[in-house]
């Protein structure tokens, strides 16, 4: 189950999922992070979670700076030791962890790789993927718990497979899609 008002802002050209060499240029271009915050109309009623393993590239730092300018709380998920090891690329001399309101350390290794292969000079095997997903899920579950404790009923989608086990799941999810359709661009 996922909160209905949780929106992943996955800018394809910046994620490295496609055209990985292009992502290097995008994540190190001034203005991209600010543009993403402005384009998605993020407001102070929202909270922005920015994930950058090194925390040193320009776009995530710019996104955090722009969010803070707009009064939006920022949570950073980053590898603190790795970030400290590297020099920031940002002209203001700041890193993501310096700008964020809350920093969650994914404890990823320097270089984001752990496995040594015999006769190969480079380590492989990311150490950030699983902790990043885990930390996001911790944030989401804590958010739901806090809202319930304060007397709110959070909007949470049922897992799609639950429609086969509980009659009103599909209707429940459809109502949430209708509620957030114009607010969340990737619905």
Give the residues covered by each predicted segment.
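Generic intrinsically disordered, low-complexity segments enriched for polar/acidic and small residues
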Residues: 22, 154, 177-178
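Acidic, Ser/Thr-rich low-complexity intrinsically disordered segments
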Residues: 163-187
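Internal, active-site/partner-interface "lid" segment
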Residues: 112-116, 134, 145-171
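A structural signal for alpha-helix termini and helix-coil/disorder junctions
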Residues: 42, 145, 149, 179-182, ...
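Glycine-rich phosphate-binding loops that contact phosphosugars or nucleotide phosphates
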Residues: 1-140
């Amino acid at each position: 189950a996922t909160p209905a008002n949780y929106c992943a802002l996955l800018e394809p050209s910046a994620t490295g999922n496609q055209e990985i060499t292009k992502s290097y240029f995008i994540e190190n271009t001034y203005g991209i992070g600010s543009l993403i915050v402005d384009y998605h109309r993020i407001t102070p009623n929202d909270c922005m979670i920015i994930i950058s393993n090194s925390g040193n590239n320009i776009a995530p730092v710019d996104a955090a700076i722009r969010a803070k300018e707009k009064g939006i709380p920022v949570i950073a998920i980053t590898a603190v030791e790795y970030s400290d090891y590297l020099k920031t690329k940002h002209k203001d001399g700041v890193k993501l962890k310096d700008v964020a309101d809350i920093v969650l350390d994914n404890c990823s290794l320097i270089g984001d790789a752990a496995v040594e292969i015999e006769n190969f000079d480079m380590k492989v095997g990311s150490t950030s993927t699983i902790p990043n997903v885990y930390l996001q899920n911790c944030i989401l579950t804590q958010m739901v718990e806090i809202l319930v404790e304060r007397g709110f009923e959070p909007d949470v989608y049922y897992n799609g497979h639950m429609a086969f086990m509980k009659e009103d799941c599909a209707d429940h999810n459809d109502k949430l899609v209708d509620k957030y359709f114009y607010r969340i661009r990737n619905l």
